[in-house]
């Protein structure tokens, strides 16, 4: 799963050559990537409803917008944009931002792992 800012179509091609990729577009993506990817995506995996979006705004604004749009409507709401990890349960919804592989805004660069066995949970892995 990729939460936006793939940047170029060449990166998209490389990622999809490795495995199946579910992704949304981000604000830094080139037009050819934006034409192929939507800003929001909804999936059902492991019996759970998952919303994916890149997001916008600062940390508190992004989380507030995610809560308003998705709280108690999906099991997992995933977002990017802020480059700051978030892993919190609010109501029945897990809000998850894995941070950023590059250019972390706070702390270390990171990626995330989403677990869908039993109740959804997530990990932020610092690199």
What are these regions (language model features)?
Residues 40-41, 85-86, 112:
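Residue-level detector of beta-strand structural context in well-folded domains
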Residues 21, 50, 122:
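Hydrophobic anchor at the start of a short beta-strand
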